[in-house]
Amino acid sequence: MRRMQTFGRTIAAAAVAAAAFGLTACGSKDSETAASATTTVAASSAPAGPTATESKGRECVAEDIGVTGGFGQAPTITIPDDCDPPSTLITKDLVPGSGPGATAGKQLTMNYSLVTWSDKQKLDSSFDRGEPFRLTLGAGMVIPGWEQGLEGVQQGARRLLIIPPDLGYGAGGNGVKPNETLVFVTDAVEVPQG
């Protein structure tokens, strides 16, 4: 008997959750009842605040990302909560460089720090290891967001790269969450001058 009562309560709870989901998925903005029911269920079963899939109404731009520290120093990267990750590659030189810009086939020496968008935490940093990263631009050694985002970078530049999932690690993740937006601050330590 006790098992049947527990089973009955479980089924009833599942029915309430399914109904709330149906209201959320299919309800209109004009339905105060649907909004009220959804809010009540959400408030009792989930933490307050927007979810990762809830749109904030606009995509972030480079100026929304906070970066402290100068060229050669490990940066602190701050991702805001009030905008969505960009759907296209964004690059911005935070510190200008000098000399010729990087082109395909050139070997670059870069320092970088990576923060993942979803959890706003540093995932990797050559600054922390004390050794810059070397790559040949256009040789397929790095993710497409780096290949495209470092094109034209000049020696001495600090460049922000906001890389959407399709130019990063995509659905496979490869050490990050699937479909993760990546935020890099890169320092062009060496760009060939000739």
Regions found by a protein language model. Give the residues of each.
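Cross-family detector of peptidyl-prolyl cis-trans isomerase
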Residues: R2-G194
